[in-house]
Amino acid sequence: MNFTFTSRTVPDCEQYLQLVYQGRQFLLDEFSEAFKTQPYQLEQLLPDCSIIYRGTTMTFDEYKASRVAISNQLNLSRQYSNSVVSLEPMLTISNFDYYKSAKFLEKAEACLQSARIYLMHGANIIEFDCNVPWEYGYLPIFGLRTINLTTAIIWYNNCFDHILQIAFLAFELYRDLKDFKHDMAFEDILRLCSYSNFTKIHKKRSNDTNFSELWTIIEDCHTALSNINIWANYAKHKGGIGYIGLKPECPYQIFVGEPDGKIEARTSEFEPIRLDADQCIPELVSGHQAICDCISALVDFIEYPKANYTIDENGRFDIPEKSTYVKIQAQQ
């Protein structure tokens, strides 16, 4: 007996976006076929179109305003350039731990800027025909959006790693850990910087009010990024991230099992975590804001300027004792 299965699979995202022009509604490939006779022609027609995206209709001006609104929510963090970079020459002399911490502050803000750019690109629901030809439909544009969103997720997750490193180095918290050795290379010390080790230090310093204040700053950010961190973990270490609508639903599932009916394996077990691209954007925006707030609070808590020194009239350096301004004293 022979069995023949026929299945036509089309990704849902092909229907996500339509253009309304001169009273008619078009998919992108249909619009391209109907009106493109020369390069850049479709871009010139776009301002005269209404956009229907996943059932919501907007004018082109309304769409542009929505892009500006997202940009305005994604503040730029400039703590390093505004208040720390000018101190670096002094920090190398007065408090090298603060200097190392400041360099990771620089990394955190650069990482945040990268995440911001990818998020803004991922939030754009349409791309110009000259960049991604409309003749191929909406799938290539949506696919590019998901790549940008996944990249943003990973960068935001990396930002939190740098936030931990800022505090870890400023206060020499690695000295609290059993795995720390005095002859460790700097790279090995950085490997000790993890959220789980911060949790151990928090338990060890449960009566340290200054550390409790630092922990609140970090934990607030960690809570705000909880979903983003889960997504990033899938992207880096598990089955990846899959986006609803990007691929057609698989028409078959394969089960392999014993004669008694026990299932050994099935295809669905290899699927990535599934996200709705448009629903994860507000979560990423909130995560961005939480990181900005965390960096600002962290810089205020560390107080880099207090490590600055003075030079008296005889040319002698007056370097403040670390115990007078460093809020969390390192274990010796």
Regions flagged by a language model, labelled:
Residues 2-110, 114, 137-147, 165-332:
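Acidic, Ser/Thr/Gly/Pro-rich intrinsically disordered interaction regions
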Residues 108, 115-118, 122-125, 145, ...:
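Small-residue hotspots
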Residues 119-122, 126, 163, 170, ...:
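Leucine-rich amphipathic alpha-helices with coiled-coil/heptad-repeat character
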Residues 127-136:
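Active-site-adjacent bridging/hinge elements
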Residues 154-169:
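Hydrophobic, aromatic-enriched interface-forming segments
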